[in-house]
């Protein structure tokens, strides 16, 4: 190694010694041995690093005298240090004789990779390199070398170059993976953005298409509704001539509408008059025939018979006495003619009843058309941007019901438009609106197949609001009874079973509900016939049996006494006293009994053909202590007993809804088993009786 130091360039050796000692570069050439040793000890430093080492300015010479350094000559001039560079390494870095000079240089790569990347340490030569020309204090130089050696020990690490290269490779591979993952995510993000843009475009396209479909649906529905309106009006005009029409008649200073029958009724009336004339003629001829009746066998003719014949001959009438055979023949002819007239009269009567039912429909349609033409919603408006009104179904006191189409759900609905009187006081309007909101809240929570569903509720303006209900195609039970008068017991029992099922649901929910206004007008026939499903509607007078107002013993107070339909309310609703009457779900049980009676007999059990005012004035319901059954039509004793249980006068004796649902008359399996067991027992008795007779014989 010493040979390598001797072969080092003297200039490089001088620069290297100046860097470590802080002594200016001597102009005199140095020995080649020191130069070679310095080059060998710092072989890792390149020439470029040596040339780029910054030089500090020379310190200002102090004026005071100081003790001469051992490195200075007797003349006071600085001379290069006479020691070898290997001695310096032992002094500066504390390396032993056997220590390699290359290990004294603190390698930056031995620190942790994070530290080496984030906070790279400068080389010791760069940290403490003094200017090459300034005089150096030996103590200061020694302290700086000690500081460098301590810093080298602190920054040293056990990492080898293989570990560092492995860490660098792993970090670079992880970095590549992360960059690849980032590229993949960016690519996926771009794809998702592209797909999202495509979906947005597709959504806009579908929205536009849906709007076109809705517009076309509205157009087709309006066109169909207009065609149906024209057909209804054409049919109504034709029926005006056939069935009749209303004419305005003046009575003094007022005008009233009077009904005039059409030609169909006039023709039937003429036929009835003709039949009556023929019947009278036949009866007259029968009386004349009775006068010519021959005497019975064995009887002598009267004495004046010859005189009568002579008198008849003089009058020109040939009324000779008939034989017995001729008399019976003529009598049989008259009987046949009377029987034929009776049959023809029955047919005419049946045709009249049919025409009366058709006339009722015609009158109803005339009123509907008149109300529709005077309605402000006749031109197919779209309410709440959703419900397209098609045609008027009916009109009440303060409301109109329209058949509409829900453009959002794509279904037919019934829209009930409540219109308040503009002349009402604000207090009355608020009360009516509060009542309607209460009905909406009650009806909105109900979900049962026998109860009409309430879909929506919204306001139009300050004086009108709407409720959207389930649409039923058929008519109500009241219209059916007006058309057919009555129905069979099986059909009526089926309707009552469905009503009781709905009432059972109303009393099982929390809080329970009393309908309070059950009547045929609030029972809808889905198919328009008595042999199909029914649905209950109109919860405007319903009572909520909450814990605050309802007592299981006495019931709840009737706060709306006087409301409702009097024919279908029980006697306790008409009791007048200091305190309002107490009611329970037995009110609906009474209504069920009245409806069942009306379906079977075609008339109401109490107050039939009476107005509500007459019922209230005459206390008709308060006097209804017992129900009477007409002899016809024939009804089973079980049905009569069921009606008596429902129409018990005292509410304490009347069954409630839970007992009504478990009534044996409404349980088909029990009735079927009983009915099948009776013929079986009868058959056993008959067989035993026949066997006994055979044994006795």
Swiss-Prot record:
Gene3D superfamilies: Transferase(Phosphotransferase) domain 1. InterPro entries: Kinase-like_dom_sf, Prot_kinase_dom, Protein_kinase_ATP_BS, Ser/Thr_kinase_AS. Its cofactor is Mg(2+). It is an enzyme of class 2 (transferase). Residues 264-293, 334-372 form a coiled coil. Phosphorylated. Autophosphorylated; phosphorylation promotes the assembly of higher order oligomers and enzymatic activity. The active site is at 517 (proton acceptor). ATP binds at residues 393-401, 416. Residues 111-131 have a biased composition (Low complexity). One of its GO terms (cellular component) is perinuclear region of cytoplasm. The keyword Signal does not apply. Residues 31-44 have a biased composition (Polar residues). Serine/threonine-protein kinase involved in the process of chromatin assembly and probably also DNA replication, transcription, repair, and chromosome segregation. Negative regulator of amino acid starvation-induced autophagy. This is Serine/threonine-protein kinase tousled-like 2. It comes from Xenopus tropicalis.
């Amino acid at each position: 190694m010493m040979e390598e130091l001797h072969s080092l360039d003297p200039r490089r050796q001088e620069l290297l010694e100046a860097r470590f000692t802080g002594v200016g570069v001597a102009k005199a050439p140095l020995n080649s041995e020191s130069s070679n040793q310095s080059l060998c000890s710092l072989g890792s430093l390149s020439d470029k690093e040596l040339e780029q080492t910054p030089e500090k300015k020379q310190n200002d010479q102090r004026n005071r005298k100081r003790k001469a350094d051992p490195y200075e000559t007797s003349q006071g001039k600085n001379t290069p240090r006479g020691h070898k560079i290997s001695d310096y390494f032992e002094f500066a870095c504390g390396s032993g004789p056997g220590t390699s000079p290359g290990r004294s240089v603190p390698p930056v790569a031995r620190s942790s990779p994070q530290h080496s990347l984030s906070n790279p340490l400068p080389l010791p030569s760069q940290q403490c390199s003094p200017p090459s020309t300034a005089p150096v204090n030996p103590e200061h130089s020694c302290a700086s070398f000690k500081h460098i050696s301590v810093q080298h020990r602190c920054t040293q690490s056990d990492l080898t170059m293989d570990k560092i290269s492995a860490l660098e490779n792993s970090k670079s591979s992880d970095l590549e993976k992360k960059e690849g993952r980032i590229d993949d995510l960016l690519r996926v993000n771009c794809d998702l953005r592209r797909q999202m843009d495509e979906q947005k475009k597709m959504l806009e396209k579908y929205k536009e298409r849906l709007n076109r479909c809705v517009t076309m649906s509205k157009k087709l529905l309006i066109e169909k509704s207009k065609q149906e309106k024209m057909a209804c009006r054409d049919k109504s005009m034709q029926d005006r001539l056939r069935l009749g029409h209303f004419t305005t008649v003046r009575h003094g200073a007022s005008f009233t509408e009077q009904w005039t029958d059409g030609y169909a009724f006039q023709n039937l009336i003429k036929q009835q008059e003709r039949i009556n004339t023929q019947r009278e003629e036949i009866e007259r001829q029968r009386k004349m025939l009775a006068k010519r009746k021959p005497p019975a066998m064995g009887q002598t003719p009267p004495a004046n018979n010859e005189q009568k014949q002579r008198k008849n001959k003089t009058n020109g009438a040939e009324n000779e006495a008939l034989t017995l055979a001729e008399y019976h023949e003529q009598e049989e002819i008259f009987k046949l003619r009377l029987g034929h007239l009776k049959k023809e009269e029955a047919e005419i009567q049946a045709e009249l009843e049919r025409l009366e039912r058709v006339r009722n429909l015609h009158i109803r349609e005339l009123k509907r058309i008149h109300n529709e033409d005077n309605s402000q919603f006749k031109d197919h408006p779209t309410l709440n941007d959703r419900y397209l009104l098609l045609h008027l179904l009916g009109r009440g006191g303060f409301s109109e019901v329209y058949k509409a189409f829900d453009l959002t759900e794509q279904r037919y609905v019934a829209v009930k438009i409540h219109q308040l009187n503009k002349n009402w006081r604000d207090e009355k309007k608020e009360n009516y609106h509060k009542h309607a909101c209460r009905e909406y809240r009650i009806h909105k929570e109900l979900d049962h197949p026998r109860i009409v569903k309430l879909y929506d509720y919204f306001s139009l303006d300050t004086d009108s609001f709407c409720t959207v209900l389930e649409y039923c195609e058929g008519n109500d039970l009241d219209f059916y009874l007006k058309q057919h008068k009555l129905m069979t017991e099986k059909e009526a029992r089926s309707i009552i079973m469905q009503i009781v099922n709905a009432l059972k649901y109303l009393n099982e929910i929390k809080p329970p509900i009393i309908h309070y206004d059950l009547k045929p007008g609030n029972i809808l026939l889905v198919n328009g016939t008595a042999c199909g499903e029914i649905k209950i509607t109109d919860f405007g007078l319903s009572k909520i049996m909450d814990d605050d107002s309802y007592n299981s013993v006495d019931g709840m107070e009737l706060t709306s006494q006087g409301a409702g339909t009097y024919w279908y309310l029980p006697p306790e609703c008409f009791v007048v006293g200091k305190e309002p009457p107490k009611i329970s779900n037995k009110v609906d049980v009474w209504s069920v009994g009245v409806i069942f009676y009306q379906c079977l007999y075609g008339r109401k059990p109490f107050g039939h053909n009476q107005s509500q005012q007459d019922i209230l004035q005459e206390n008709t319901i308060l006097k209804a202590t017992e129900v009477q059954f007409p002899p016809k039509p024939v009804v089973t004793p079980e049905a009569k007993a069921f009606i008596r249980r429902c129409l018990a006068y005292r509410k304490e004796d009347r069954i409630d809804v839970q007992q009504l649902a478990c009534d044996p008359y409404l349980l088909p399996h029990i009735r079927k088993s009983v009915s099948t067991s009776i013929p079986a027992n009868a058959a056993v008795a008959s067989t035993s009786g026949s066997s006994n007779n055979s044994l006795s014989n």
